[in-house]
């Protein structure tokens, strides 16, 4: 009987580990923050280029950034969100704009 008890405990531990592994990844909001210098057209370009929005949705989000101070551009896993933030910030600097893209836990 000792062996059956040990086997049962081992199965329970394995089941617990599988449940832990099946948790969905943490998600993060990628956020564009308003500034007084970046042209609206550039923000629209960023939203189309890095987030694949059409012109109408990109314009709506740009106006949200402009009037509300920030807008969520998308919700992604940590790795994808970090990559988007780096890409957008690099693109803004290369084009000499102070546009700031950040991430926050969703």
Swiss-Prot record:
InterPro entries: ClpS, ClpS_core, Ribosomal_bL12_C/ClpS-like. GO terms for biological process: protein catabolic process; proteolysis. Gene3D superfamilies: 3.30.1390.10. Disulfide bonds: none annotated. Residues 1-21 are annotated as: Disordered. Residues 1-13 have a biased composition (Polar residues). It comes from the Bacteria. NCBIfam families: PRK00033.1-3, PRK00033.1-5. Belongs to the ClpS family. Involved in the modulation of the specificity of the ClpAP-mediated ATP-dependent protein degradation. Binds to the N-terminal domain of the chaperone ClpA. This is ATP-dependent Clp protease adapter protein ClpS. It comes from Pectobacterium carotovorum subsp. carotovorum (strain PC1). The lineage of its organism: Bacteria, Pseudomonadati, Pseudomonadota, Gammaproteobacteria, Enterobacterales.
